[in-house]
Design a protein with these regions (language model features):
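Polysaccharide-binding surfaces and accessory modules of carbohydrate-active proteins
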Residues: 1-190
Length: 190
């Protein structure tokens, strides 16, 4: 929930927090993690995976605080998370631009362990959608064929949009995409 602060604790009952983790309902009901760490009971790929300096690969983040403030054209919400076993803090930033119907997000990860740690996964965000169909629009290019748009319905599995060109990413494989929920993207949605 990224809206205004609730006035009464019982207002939480108006939100649908629980889901079945397995299609057959074989796993206990629980909510989705906003930024899942490795080693918890989520079956999806974690947003963050750290091997701590003692060799433990688990990171379980807990809610610490949140705040919202007005920014140019929208609202920024900041969520602070912390591991209760290791000195790891994650700050999630969400900037919502209502006029454009766009959400910008990024994360900041800070560790204060006395020895180096190993990050094997770190994501800017972790988004969950619960729709019946998803459509991907991506861009590719070549010489004199810049930003060629193509779309496809996504099927089960992982789709990777990647480029190894660094600052030259715009030359061939753009790491940019749009996702359509239940329908292909269009000029006004996706």
């Amino acid at each position: 929930y990224l809206g205004e602060k609730l006035l009464h604790e019982q207002d939480l009952n108006n939100f649908s927090w629980s889901i079945h983790a397995g299609a057959d309902g074989s796993v206990s009901r629980r909510g989705w993690e906003v930024y899942s760490g490795s080693g918890n009971e989520d079956y999806f790929e974690p947003a963050i995976a750290i091997t701590h300096n003692d060799g433990n690969p688990s990171t379980i983040l807990y809610y610490v605080s949140s705040s919202s403030k007005a920014v140019d054209g929208g609202t920024e919400t900041v969520i602070n998370l912390r591991d209760d076993k290791y000195p790891v803090d994650v700050t999630l930033h969400y900037v919502a631009y209502p006029k454009e119907n766009v959400i910008k997000t990024w994360s900041e990860i800070i560790h204060q362990e006395k020895k180096p740690v190993m990050f094997s996964t770190y994501a800017s965000t972790m988004l969950y959608f619960n729709n019946s169909a998803y459509y991907l629009t991506e861009f590719s290019s070549d010489w004199a064929k810049e930003a060629q748009m193509s779309s496809q319905q996504l099927q089960f599995g992982k789709k990777v949009i990647d480029t190894k060109l660094g600052s030259r990413a715009a030359m061939h494989t753009h790491p940019f995409f749009e996702v359509g929920l239940d329908q292909p993207v269009s000029e006004n949605q996706g």
